[in-house]
Amino acid sequence: MIDIKLKNLPLIISIASGKGGVGKSIITSNLANTLANDGHRVLVWDGNYTFPNQHIMFGVEPPYRAKDTYIGRVDLSSVLYKMNDNLYLLADYSVNEIELEIDIDKILNVFKQLITNYEFDFILIDTAAGLSELLLNFINISHLVCIVLDDNPSSLIDSYALIKIFLRFINPEQIKLIINNIIDNEDFDEINTKINLVSRNFLGQSFETIGYLPYDREIHKSIIHQELFTNSTNKQLKEYMENLAQYFIEYYKYN
């Protein structure tokens, strides 16, 4: 694993979840878009090695993907897909398109190139749901790790299990929570209380919830139409994401 205690790095954020279907990827893409719209240079790295979907979220089809550079087919500069002046995507193929065993060293070499040869303010890594060796390497190269969860009991259980394992590798202060699909403030309070009650009782730690998104049909429509809801006219949804982005902007400024 790589030690990232270096100066002048971009803020590297891994976005994880204990289970699939909680909105991790849609939050990643819209957070990146919000940060880029605010004038920051942002890279989205699709770290889902088996079923990547960030290119779907953005509605683009990059000609080259991360696995092309892992195997030496093209260099990294050919793989980084420019969506606008501030927003770039390191997309990937799913495993049924190109078979390739995970070579952690090659993936971490890409990381070294990113922080050495490119000037990004933020790198957002959209990881695969659940636990894997690759995920543990991603969290180790990240300054912050955000766990996305919702009110589904299995989401709460799996999020707790993920936190428990993460604490073996990173400091508690690096772990943040993002709650998705809330119905109202009472729903938010209930989810936040449940996950932190369990964490305090069994791990002796509580974790900061830095943002949330409501359940909204427009979010689901944006996925179907491969459009970002932060590009829509829905001011309320955009405000939720702007509040989340502001957390990272402030963190980047003062850390």
Where are these regions (language model features)?
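Acidic-aromatic/histidine active-site loop/patch
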Residues: 1-12, 250-255
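Short, hinge-like loop/turn segments at secondary-structure boundaries
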Residues: 59-64, 165-166, 193-196, 228-230
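Walker A/P-loop phosphate-binding motif and the immediately C-terminal alpha-helix
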Residues: 5-47
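Conserved catalytic-core segment of NTP-binding enzymes
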Residues: 116, 127-211
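NTP-binding/hydrolysis catalytic cores, primarily Walker-type P-loop NTPases
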Residues: 224-255
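Beta-strand-loop-alpha "switch" segments that mediate conformational coupling across diverse proteins
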Residues: 201-229
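P-loop/Walker-type NTP enzyme "switch/lid" segment
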Residues: 44-121, 223-225
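Conserved nucleotide-binding/hydrolysis micro-motifs of P-loop NTPases
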Residues: 49-50, 85, 94-97, 130, ...
